């Protein structure tokens, strides 16, 4: 299986410009099966390296077909550098349910190290601090920014096989906080978002003023959010306040389900709701903008010497030939076009 995938993915890269790289997947049999999620890592323009796992559906070989993308942002329990827990630990059940569903899609799951987290404990979406932090359209969260840059580049470099009207996002706990933040920062990117226990109190803390300040950023994106009413970690009041603010701002694309008696780890319950997965894949986005993509001078500077030149194109070609997951032929062509236009 591993050898077969390696040969296929290498051939796919040389012929179609698809992202590649194969490694062992989850060791947890009841979650994601082994050897199906390939390994990758990306060094962002801020110098941080993000490990990630991605999955290409069996029908990926079909010529001319494009696929939706399902992105999962893990919670604090899946942090690390093993490039495994974000697809194998608790909190990834919805990711697994999507994998086992009848929907063919490309899947990607970045990992944050244990030394940090996607969203600061005192700045969850809906808090006064979060509203102040993103007032200029940016957020100083280094690993979240690196992950968003990775996702933007992954989508752009594989644009030949990705249906950009169907970019889906989910998150659990701190990863759900990241999902809320990603929509606020990139309101035209995602077709559907499922945050689970993603903001609250006393962490956050979510306030009516903080929620009202960002509510308009969520009006155009279909969101189905979940929270347990007995959550002792992120109290449900935070989600209540944020949801109310969005609805008061005129939001009509927001669904909110309270899990009665649900503690913090509600993700297994959500994953057992087939209507959630059906809802996700029914959503389409006709206003897609890849605003997660860094400036071309950053994206195409493979050797990070501050200049895009033929040396960068050669590095990309060598990486592709060696079976690396960093670049595709689309990236090489974009580099040559950038050089020619200088």
Write out the residue ranges for each language-model feature:
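Active-site machinery of serine-nucleophile hydrolases
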Residues: 76-145
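A domain-start/cap signature at the N-terminus of enzymes
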Residues: 21-69, 105, 174-177, 182, ...
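Sec-dependent N-terminal signal peptides of Gram-positive bacterial secreted proteins and lipoproteins
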Residues: 4-23
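Primarily recognizes the serine-hydrolase "nucleophile elbow" in alpha/beta-hydrolase
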Residues: 156-209, 214
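Alpha-helical segments with a strong preference for the paired helices of cellulosomal dockerin domains
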Residues: 296, 302-342
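The feature captures the conserved acid-bearing segment of alpha/beta-hydrolase catalytic domains
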Residues: 188-285
